Amino acid sequence: MIVNASSESPRVQPQLYRTASISTIVQAEQQDRFLQLGELNDLVTFLNSGTKRLEIAEVLSKNADILVAKAADKIFVGGSAISYLERPQASFVEFDNISMTQKEMSGNVQVNLLSNTSSNVISNDTLPPGFKPINVVRYGSTRMKKSLRDLDWFLRYLTYAIIAGDPNILSVNIRGLKDLISNACSSAAATVALREMRKSAISIFDNDLSAQEIVQQYFNILITEFDSPSLTDKIRRRTSTDVQGLRLPQIYSKSGIPLQRFVMKTSLSNEEKSSVLKACYRQVFERDIAKAYNLSFVDLESQVKNGSLSIKEFIRRIGKSSVYRKQFYEPFVNSRVVELAFKHFLGRGLSSLEEFQKYFSILSLRGLNGLIDALINSLEYADYFAEETCPYLRGLSEEPLESRNWGVQFSLLNYSAPFRKVPQFITLFSDYKMSLPDQHPYGLGNDHLALQFGAIFPNSLTALSNKSAFFGRYTRRILLRQGPGIYSQISNPQARSKSIGSLGPKIFKLNSIDNTYFSDEVMSLPPDIEQIIKAIYLRVFGRFIYLEELSSVRKFESLFRSSKISVRDFIRNLVKSSVFRSLYWEPLYICKAIEYIHYRLLGRPSYGRQEINQYFDIVYREGYYKMIDYLLNSSEYIRSFGDNTVPYERYITSANMILKSNYSNFLYSTLKTKNSNSKKFIELSNILEKRSLNSIQARISQGVSTVRDQYKVFQLTQLSSQVDKRQVVKAIYRQIFERDLNSFAIGDEFINLEKALVNNNITVQQFIEQIGSSSLYGREFYQPYPNTKVIELGTKHFLGRAPNNQAEIRYYNQILASQGLSSFITVLVNSNEYNQVFGVNIVPYRRFTTLPAANFPNTEKLYNTLTKQSSEIIVPSFIVVPGNQ
């Protein structure tokens, strides 16, 4: 399945191999415990043997050439095999201060056919079937070089594994090479060479039995892995046609840190069963709630330990518990609830939009319990976890991941996922269907602004600022050019050198005759070479350089003043200087640095992926200086600026253009206001035109929407029917809880209060006071928020406005902190303001026209915030006056 778009790509470095220390520590970390005594002893043993392992690796490295030569002479005849080793891979270092026994092998590597034949007879190892000595001349020099290189690589991997203390690096890099070498020459010959290398390496440590055991152990593993067949890929088959079928090479799973599978068995001890239950808590609640909060499901745990309840049903029960509901359902919108549920119960993220729509509809129709049942009863859960296995995170190195949700998958599997309120997958899937934005191919945050450039991927917890970019190889970003459109270099490359005139930027050009410069646009500047030098510094560095920095580029400036180098060469030397590299190359990411240099030298941002990839290739292959030469020697630079023109801004992004335009307009309006005569305010306040009634009414509204006139007052009277009374009850729920009660509660918590209100036993005011003091209101609007936010929500629900000032917030905060929520609600409902505005039988509503002008913006912001979408405190912005603060 071809995917044309993918999510943002975080920096992921797969584990290349395992070491003894990392494997021990990670196992304890996965179980959320300290290292046990046996594990500590293993670490001590490994660390104590570190010096011995380093000595063994050092001796093997010093004798690498001879070991490779002995192995090559075993399988090659008719010439000197070692002469084809292009360069020695081992580094010979002089150890003056290290007292260790220097062991070296001696021998003549220039052997002949007779010695090779005798060595085959003397060898104790049985020759593998199909082995024949290889003639050097017939084999060819190219193949000989590759074969000697491969033998040296085998020895190098062996030393890596010895130092790491784990043969995993051999399994990852050697397994499967047999098929590859069989296609090139002979795998049997490679086996014979490795055996000879083992024999020679062991003979080095003739007086060190422990070193011989270590070398023989790792050589045996190397030969076994080489002779073993290659691993098959891990296939992830899918049951639906809307999701990808995936394939992962086994080396990724073998090199990575394996996740421990926690499987409940009746034969386990009580302690082992407890560890399985803790793993379930860590997977579902993302932490061990027994250790963190002293919470546990004692009855369910006892049933699991007794065998009457499976792990699958245990996961189902704790997922439906009030603890899970409070932590991962109530604080989030439904879209995010679905994403987190996939992480907790299936160990992965969403795969497609169709999958999201399916489970979102289940959550909407059947609630959280229905969603959990659908996930746990799915075929995928049964295939991966069955009845007794605790779910686990199926991330990198566990199984293949989809490319279209690569970035958000990693973000979801992080520990910080519950802190992100915004749904990521549905936002990403919706972006797939949108038109191409005018952005850089490397990310949304990569638009080349004057203050923001390069590969910048902002990581935000509140807003998805790192979205996908559907750019292919041949997609080009839209850039704006000052001046006529017919001068665009895309449609008219010959017009690159044409001056735009007064429509474009100021162009500084050196006159090669008298060593002065002229400006096409600004004729009042003096013909001083100092000006053009300053223009070059401003263009290259973006500022004037300091005196300390100037000392390192003074020699280039002197050459330029004496007309020994041109403007282009002067810029070349400046960009290659240590000052420029320390500012704009060494501390930045490569993409970010290339973007900046490209913009400074060519006067425009890069067009897209294809253009910037060629700079990547030059930097990695030939270095930084070659990339600078490539830019300054390019046909675009020569046609646009030549040798004696200072580069200038030729193209700009639309976002940067808008940014500069807004700032210019703001600056112009500010200066114009300052220069205006302030004494004319009386004259300017006179009305010159004749205004109609509609014009006056429009001015009175002051930009406020018509919503303030479109409200309905729900009032309970003696003549109200049963239907009207039910409408009043629903209006109260919508005002106090900001939504219908049935959307988040069972609906029968206040059945007795509703009957009393319908039977006229209590008033609307008393009914509101009772539901405001209920546990449901406390759970929704008191427990999740700080006191200041509770006060804001309380005035919104019961008085229809935001807090008037800080003094009012402090007053209610004292009541809330000392007497609790019930007293706070009682004070609000029984206040003079409530009685004057609403009385005893009117449902509170949003008060538009009666609000003071200073408090209107805060009330507007408070009411426009979606229900429970933000816990941000709306701080009133009042002028500090006595009594207000």
From Swiss-Prot:
Binding site for (2R,3E)-phycocyanobilin: 185
Cell compartments where the protein resides: Plastid, Chloroplast thylakoid membrane
Keywords carried by this UniProt record: Antenna complex, Bile pigment, Chloroplast, Chromophore, Electron transport, Lyase, Membrane, Photosynthesis, Phycobilisome, Plastid, Repeat, Thylakoid, Transport
EC annotation from Swiss-Prot or TrEMBL: 4.-.-.-
UniProt GO BP: photosynthesis
Domain PBS-linker: 242-422, 498-680, 694-871
Stored Pfam families: PBS_linker_poly, Phycobilisome
Top-level class of the enzyme under EC nomenclature: lyase
Gene3D superfamilies membership: Phycobilisome linker domain (1.10.3130.20), Phycocyanins (1.10.490.20)
Record's keyword annotation contains Electron transport: yes
GO MF annotations, alphabetized: lyase activity
Protein modification: Contains one covalently linked bilin chromophore. This protein autochromophorylates (Potential).
UniProt membrane topology term: Peripheral membrane protein
Family membership noted in the UniProt record: Belongs to the phycobilisome linker protein family.
Name listed for the protein in its UniProt record: Phycobiliprotein ApcE
Species whose genome carries this gene: Aglaothamnion neglectum (Red alga)
Gene this chain is encoded by: apcE
